[in-house]
């Protein structure tokens, strides 16, 4: 009987510990600011004008360009970058995938943007004012999110 009670007590303690761990994880997830990468350039420019922020326009080949995948994985997908970007830029991706299908409207918009800004290689990252004028042009940078944020800050001055 004592062994049975001891086992029950240990099982109850384990359940409480596991429940406590899960709640801390969800609290951590809530600390990341809301961040959304947009695809509609005109809406992004309007949002940039309203919020007085520059537009970060990323030209990418998300499913075939190795440097694009690396930039997304090392920078754009990190909580550090998402937190910074949520406060400082309106981010838009003009994607040119090989396999993934985009709507005809999105394909047309991305082609028009590529031609308008004279994009010849991927990834190309443009920092624009809210009217769509180029402030700076860059691409992949070594060093992860912290280095990329510092690089973008230097371009925004």
Mark where each language-model region is:
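C-terminal motif of bacterial Sec signal peptides marking the signal peptidase cleavage site
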Residues: 17-20
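A short beta-strand-turn-helix
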Residues: 37-55, 85
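Short active-site neighborhood of thiol/selenol oxidoreductases, capturing the structured segment around
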Residues: 51-65
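Thiol-based oxidoreductase modules, predominantly thioredoxin-like and allied folds used
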Residues: 37-38, 81-107
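Non-catalytic, surface beta->alpha helical segment in thiol-disulfide oxidoreductase systems
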Residues: 74, 115-157
């Amino acid at each position: 009987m004592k062994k049975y009670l001891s086992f029950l007590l240990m099982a109850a303690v384990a359940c409480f510990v596991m429940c406590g761990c899960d709640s801390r994880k969800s609290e951590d997830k809530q600390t990341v600011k809301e961040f959304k990468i947009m695809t509609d350039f005109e809406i992004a420019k309007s949002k940039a004008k309203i919020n007085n922020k520059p537009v970060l326009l990323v030209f990418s080949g998300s499913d075939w360009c190795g440097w694009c995948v690396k930039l997304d994985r090392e920078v754009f997908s990190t909580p550090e970058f998402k937190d910074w970007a949520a406060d400082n830029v309106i981010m838009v991706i003009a994607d040119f995938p090989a396999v993934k299908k985009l709507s005809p409207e999105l394909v047309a918009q991305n082609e028009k943007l590529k031609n308008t800004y004279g994009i010849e290689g991927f990834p190309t990252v443009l920092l624009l004012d809210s009217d769509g004028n180029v402030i700076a042009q860059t691409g992949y940078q070594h060093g992860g999110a912290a280095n990329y944020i510092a690089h973008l800050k230097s371009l925004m001055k």
